[in-house]
Every structure is written in C-alpha cells, then in structure tokens.
Amino acid sequence: KRQPADRKRFHELRSESDAILIGGSTARREPYKKTPVPLFIITHSLVRLQPKNQLAKQLNLPPAAALQEISNFFAQKERAQILVEAGPKLLTKMIEERLIQTLYLTINHDATGENIIDLADLVKNFKLLSSVKVENDEFQSFELA
C-alpha cells in the first residue's frame, strides 16, 4: 500500500510530466481512471485496459518504438517529460535499453512483495543524485551516467 509521503511524491512527479507511461500489468492492477496528463499503455492486449480514462492510449509496440510514438504525440514540444510508472519487467527492459534518463525510486524498508529487484544491478548505469528518508520510505533519484 502506498504511504502518504510516497503518494505526495507521485503527485509532484505527475504534475511535472507531459505524459504517463505504464505497462499492461500495471494497467490491470492499478486504477488510472483519471490522470492529469495523457496515459500511454504498452501492452499486447487487445482489450481496452483503462476504458474510463479518456486520455488513455494503448500501444502494442516495444518500449523504444512506444517512446518514439509518444514523442510524435508531443511533436510541438522540444522535449516531453514522460513519467514511467512501470513494474519491474518493463522498467528493467527500458533501463537495459537506456531509455530512462532520470530514475526515481521509492524503497519501503518495511514492505515485502513478490517482485524483488536487485537494486544494485538496476542502478549500475546511474549516478545517485539524492536520497531522502521519510519514515519507512526512502526516496532516491538517479541520473543516467
């Protein structure tokens, strides 16, 4: 369950973004009925995953091609801020392909889950910019090295 400090941080990041990108698994698990900016979903599913969100668009493309498609959507802007709220599978793939420039992590030291990630491996090509602890959450930001 998302903690108040984590929820606040998510809302701040969303307010600074032009679009949100999620994977199909995240779209099936999380409610994205209303987003302040367009929502793009990378999925192989033909079923509309967020039917109540008028700003949602599904892309049946690999991550690099999906980002190009999203960039075309924002062609009038010099640079679009795309917030990726992905699970471990999509996030790892995007990091391996060097598609993530800035990485924001929330580490909850009390939580356990089925999707355990090797953090050292995940951030090996990134440089730590900041780390702030609020209660049991640790907020870290990294930049691609």
Language model: regions and residue ranges:
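Enzymes that bind and transform nitrogen-containing heteroaromatic metabolites
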Residues: 1-145
